[in-house]
């Protein structure tokens, strides 16, 4: 392990609209980082634990290291206005795995206005996808403008949906200013190294 156990675990929130690739990103991050870091993951769904099931089936982490939370209502409420259900889930996972280096918290499918409570997440990654249209970055919203890292996913689909990656990149730069963003296709691994490097650097995992 790279990180000393004297440090508290890094909590990384992963948000974005339904179908943007949040669960796939989380799966790929876990598979790429699990040999270097002690990881646990918490997923949010409104009425099911589908994302927990998908992560478990994919072998991202051992089943006991993945916890599903049923929010039973508006998904962004459970990560922002009343994050108690997720804070409790974090506490339960850390009681089982006190040496965890990173706690990944995936929100349920949400809108562009959703953000993570600072009580819940140290770093936030917001995922949008090219299939949603090239206009998405310029629509703004806290997820796009204020997240620590924006991931513009599924760039390989641009030719099929008539989206201009150049326009999306330009708009993302305008909306985010100095805040970083990554363009890629996480399912194929494109851009994944950049996301991991960001987590390690900003989360001081490599200290």
Curated annotation (Swiss-Prot):
Family annotation (SUPFAM superfamilies): P-loop containing nucleoside triphosphate hydrolases
Molecular-function GO term, any one: nickel cation binding
Keyword Cytoplasm: yes
GO cellular component: cytoplasm
Mitochondrion keyword on record: no
Alphabetical GO biological process terms: urea catabolic process
Subcellular compartments: Cytoplasm
Positions with a binding annotation for GTP: 16-23
HAMAP family (UniProt xref): UreG
Family the entry assigns: Belongs to the SIMIBI class G3E GTPase family. UreG subfamily.
UniProt subunit comment: Homodimer. UreD, UreF and UreG form a complex that acts as a GTP-hydrolysis-dependent molecular chaperone, activating the urease apoprotein by helping to assemble the nickel containing metallocenter of UreC. The UreE protein probably delivers the nickel.
Protein name stated in the entry: Urease accessory protein UreG
Source organism: Cupriavidus metallidurans (strain ATCC 43123 / DSM 2839 / NBRC 102507 / CH34)
